[in-house]
């Protein structure tokens, strides 16, 4: 949101709290994992499609999630039978959405994320384990180190405060700019960038 405000760019941000199965999932993952992941997948597809219909074709946008997030979390949360079924829905959704040009992966250790989760004090997240976060982190990195049609920038935020420290934020922006301009493309097409946070949802 700070980047969007700084550059007056439209942003698409996930409203995870609307998922009616999320709190139940944290209490009983085995019972609600398929429901929570399917809801997130369908909502992400719908939100991306609706948002892109409202903007100009060549307009730069930033999103704090991508559909790839659905695959990464479902692989961690679903059993093999449900995952195989889920992948069919994921691939259908993937075919409906244009890939981003750039993904900025804000990297942080599981311990750092666990501390942030505790400080924000959401009751339903209190039992999240560092092991779970480590598995999610490994899922993200295993996915993004592969060759893709889009560019991926890994940026470590463990020692940075992007919210309260302008120097840290400006360093991120400069890093993104320098990384992007290494490519000789003359312009950016939508969707421009997706900020991926290796969080717990």
Regions found by a protein language model. Name each.
Residues 5-43:
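Conserved substrate/cofactor phosphate-moiety recognition/catalytic segment
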Residues 10, 61, 151-153:
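Conserved beta-strand segments of alpha/beta enzyme cores
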């Amino acid at each position: 949101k700070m980047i969007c405000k700084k550059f007056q760019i439209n942003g698409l941000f996930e409203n995870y709290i609307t998922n009616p199965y999320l709190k139940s999932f944290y209490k009983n993952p085995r019972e609600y994992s398929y429901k929570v992941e399917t809801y997130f997948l369908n909502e992400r597809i719908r939100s991306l499609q609706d948002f892109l219909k409202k903007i100009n074709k060549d307009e730069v946008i930033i999103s704090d999630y991508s559909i790839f997030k659905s695959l990464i979390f479902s692989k961690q949360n679903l059993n093999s039978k449900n995952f195989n079924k889920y992948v069919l829905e994921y691939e259908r959704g993937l075919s409906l959405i244009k890939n981003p040009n750039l993904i900025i992966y804000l990297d942080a250790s599981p311990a750092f994320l666990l501390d942030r989760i505790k400080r924000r004090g959401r009751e339903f997240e209190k039992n999240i384990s560092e092991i779970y976060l480590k598995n999610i982190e490994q899922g993200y990195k295993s996915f993004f180190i592969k060759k893709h049609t889009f560019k991926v920038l890994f940026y470590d935020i463990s020692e940075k405060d992007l919210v309260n420290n302008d120097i840290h934020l400006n360093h991120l922006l400069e890093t993104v700019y320098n990384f992007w301009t290494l490519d000789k493309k003359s312009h950016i097409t939508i969707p421009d960038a997706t900020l991926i946070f290796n969080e717990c949802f």
